[in-house]
């Protein structure tokens, strides 16, 4: 069977369902697939296909995730749904499924529950920029006032975590009734799709962001100078661009005098490409793996940050024992390990394998970082945790 060609003509947006267990995330995912494919064309995925989420491994962590795709007239969406709460935690922290926006599913029959709150907090910590609310099971609530009350509660909860609770879209619907084909409830799914189209802005493509290349290797070429190699993470570097070398040591400026790929000289290196960048007047010993090459002023080196961390379970190849304050592992950022110390939240004495935890990390030397940067925690080359920079402190 021939592979379907990927149509590039519509903007591509990544979304996902979040919310408390049994509030109807997977049913809603199936309803979106059914209603949108019926209305705008496309392949339908039923509940069983979505619910039977395949196991994936991201940095050694086992995550069950379902991926579906659907179209609206103006966009193409990739949507992730996870069967279990632990899968959401892992997914959001590792960035296995980066979300441009999330659909928070809240059952009108229950209102916000503990995992509702935890998923909102996680979204805030890992940098999910936009949330849309789908109040589900509204067909089971006869009382108009009760629906208003639940909506108010959800909006207040979102505001508590710095999302614009008063302004974001809340759609009242029933995923099950929409899935059964009842027109009044199908209309609510179309309303949700319209909210996705209008409320979540089109994400900036990697190529349009400021240039960044994590340095993997450094060579000196006699008569030409120093070449750094790596995969361009974002943006474009052109010959004669001024660039900064950031992290590990004090930041220095230099100029790109050449770009090479597969031994050919190019005018530019673009996001996603592996290339070598020739640097003017830079000595071989001035640069090392673990630094980044970046557009001047676009990224700064930092040592201390608040992070959200998932600690691998024993079954995932992680630690067999808890760790305590004073733990000093390596933190792997992009291409290199840096030793760091941790500070646990007040009242937390130890962290067990399989836990997720907020911690403040202080590295022994600075690394180029922004909020949202992912890292691994390692001991002697073995991954024992995954984390994300939630807030830079220093």
From Swiss-Prot:
Residues 174-176 are annotated as: G5. Mg(2+) binds at residue 26. This is Elongation factor Tu 1. Residues 81-84 are annotated as: G3. The lineage of its organism: Bacteria, Pseudomonadati, Pseudomonadota, Gammaproteobacteria, Alteromonadales. It comes from Shewanella frigidimarina (strain NCIMB 400). One of its GO terms (molecular function) is guanosine tetraphosphate binding. GTP hydrolase that promotes the GTP-dependent binding of aminoacyl-tRNA to the A-site of ribosomes during protein biosynthesis. Its EC number is 3.6.5.3. Monomer. One of its GO terms (cellular component) is cytosol. Belongs to the TRAFAC class translation factor GTPase superfamily. Classic translation factor GTPase family. EF-Tu/EF-1A subfamily. Residues 136-139 are annotated as: G4. HAMAP family: EF_Tu_B.
């Amino acid at each position: 069977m021939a592979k379907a060609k990927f149509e590039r003509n519509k903007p591509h947006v990544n979304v996902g369902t979040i919310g408390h267990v049994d509030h109807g995330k997977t049913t809603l995912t199936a309803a979106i697939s059914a209603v949108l494919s019926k209305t705008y064309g496309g392949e339908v995925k039923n509940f069983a296909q979505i619910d039977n989420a395949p196991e994936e491994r991201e940095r050694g962590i086992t995550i069950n995730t379902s991926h579906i795709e659907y179209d609206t007239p103006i966009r193409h969406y990739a949507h992730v749904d996870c069967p279990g709460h632990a899968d959401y935690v892992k997914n959001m922290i590792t960035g296995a499924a980066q979300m441009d926006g999330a659909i928070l599913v809240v059952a009108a029959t229950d209102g916000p529950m503990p995992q509702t709150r935890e998923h909102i907090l996680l979204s805030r910590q890992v940098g999910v920029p936009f949330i849309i609310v789908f109040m589900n099971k509204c067909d089971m609530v006869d009382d108009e006032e009760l629906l208003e009350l639940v909506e108010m509660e959800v909006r207040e909860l979102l505001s508590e975590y710095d999302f614009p609770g008063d302004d974001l879209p809340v759609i009242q619907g029933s995923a099950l009734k929409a899935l059964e084909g009842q027109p009044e409830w199908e209309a609510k799914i179309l309303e949700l799709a319209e909210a996705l189209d209008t409320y979540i802005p089109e994400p900036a493509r990697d190529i349009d962001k400021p240039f960044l290349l994590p340095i993997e290797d450094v060579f000196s070429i006699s008569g030409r100078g120093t070449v750094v190699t790596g995969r361009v993470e974002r943006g474009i570097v052109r010959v004669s661009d001024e660039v900064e070398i950031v992290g590990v040591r004090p930041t220095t400026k230099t100029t790109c005098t050449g770009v090479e790929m597969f031994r050919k000289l190019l005018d530019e290196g673009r996001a996603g490409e592996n290339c070598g960048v020739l640097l003017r007047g830079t000595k071989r010993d001035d640069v090392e793996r673990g630094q980044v090459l970046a557009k001047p002023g676009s990224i700064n080196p930092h040592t201390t940050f608040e992070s959200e961390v998932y600690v691998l379970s024993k079954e995932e190849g992680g630690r067999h024992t808890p760790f305590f304050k004073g733990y000093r592992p390596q933190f792997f950022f992009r291409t290199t390990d840096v030793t760091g110390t941790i500070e646990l939240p007040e009242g937390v004495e130890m962290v067990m394998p399989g836990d997720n935890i907020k911690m403040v990390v202080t590295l022994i030397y600075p690394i180029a970082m922004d909020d949202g940067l992912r890292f691994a925690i390692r001991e002697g080359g073995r991954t024992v945790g995954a984390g994300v920079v939630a807030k830079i402190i220093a």
